[in-house]
Structure formats: C-alpha cells, structure tokens
Amino acid sequence: MRHWRIDIVSEAREFAARWGFLTQDLFFEFMCPMSRAHKFRYWNSLVECGHFRRSNASDKVLILSPKSRNIFGDAVRPARQSIYIEHDTIAARVVLALKNRNLISRYWLEDELMRNPVDAFSVLGGEQVPRIPDVVFDLRSNAGGSVRCSLEIERTTKSRSRYAKIALAYLGYSKVSVMLFACDSASAEAVVRQSFSGKAFVDKKRVPGLFNLNEFDS
C-alpha cells in the first residue's frame, strides 16, 4: 500500500500497551480514518507484520505480540481477559471520543493507578484510596486549564452497600471535580443517585453525573 501510515500502527500499539487489548471497532472508528477497504488492510497488517496476535476469544480483538511487548517494557499492561473487554471498550470509547476532539489533556487507567499507589494518591487527592475509578482524566476547560474527572462504567448493578462505600471513597478525593457514572439501567442510576444524596455529598459537591452507557456501547 502506498503512503503507509506508520502513525496509525504506532497509535494502535500504544493503545494496546495501556489498555491490554484492541478491538476492531475501536481501531476502525478512532485510529484508522480511511475507507472501509483500507481499514481492513491496516487491521490485518497489524497481525501480519507481527505487531499483534489475535485473541483466542474473538478474531475482532487483538493483543500485543511478544515483540511489541518487549518494545514497551515493564510499562506494558498484561493482555486483558476477555470477560472484561466489553466493559473496557465502553470506557475506551468515551476516552477516545473526547481525545479526538482534543478535550482530554491526560488520562489514567485503574490498572495504572493500582500499580503505582503514589500516583493514585497524587491523582485522586485522597489520604486513603479504597476505590480507584475505571478512568481518571483531565478535561480541558474554556479558561485554558483543566477539570479532573472520573469515569465509572456500571454494566451490572451492585448492591446498595457497595455503592455506599464507593460514594464514601469519593468524599475524600479532593482532586476529582467531576464524577461520571455510565449506567446500564435505570435501577443502577437510581442506586448511584441515592448513594450520593446525603448532605455531606451536596456540601462537598460530590454529586455525580449519570448517563446511559448504551449511548457508547456500539
């Protein structure tokens, strides 16, 4: 193929190094702005050139090859288990949609903060970190600065006690200004809203924004 876009391959590898996987849908939508025929050529070349290997769970999911993993060294994330990929794909779609609009200056994944407790304390601003969000990101503001946001993907409804613990954790995260919960159902939205409804949450402006995750699950 003429005018081979090395940057497309690089972006795909860098994404997989952080997230532990790459789906065909994410690659087509956010990383390969070409005709459908060219999208498939690039997708297939990721494996043929040795950058990736196909997941045993689906031929529409790729994971980094040993060769690519060696390039990224210790920073590379382990290959994501197939049971978590649907959940993580939703989070990735939100992040990539904002990044493509140049709205995110930086982001951190749960796995990255779990592996680096010092970073977790610094990024979240808590004396204790009993709960790490799925994603934390800095959203660019009109004033030229940024607003730190957290994103939680709720594909299943947890117990009320579990959400109560999550809400209490957020009370202590002084550096998180906006909390976003993407919920799969109205019942999940109701439980999350109730968990953050006490006076302490209102006084500290710890009231989350809720939206339907199915808007991004395509």
Q: Which ranges hold each PLM region?
A:
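Nuclease-adjacent, charged terminal/linker segments that flank catalytic cores
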Residues: 1-79
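Short, amphipathic alpha-helical interaction segments positioned at domain boundaries
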Residues: 68-93, 98
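Extended alpha-helical interface modules used as scaffolds for assembling large macromolecular complexes
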Residues: 97, 101-105
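Basic, amphipathic alpha-helical patches used to engage nucleic acids or provide basic targeting signals
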Residues: 158-176
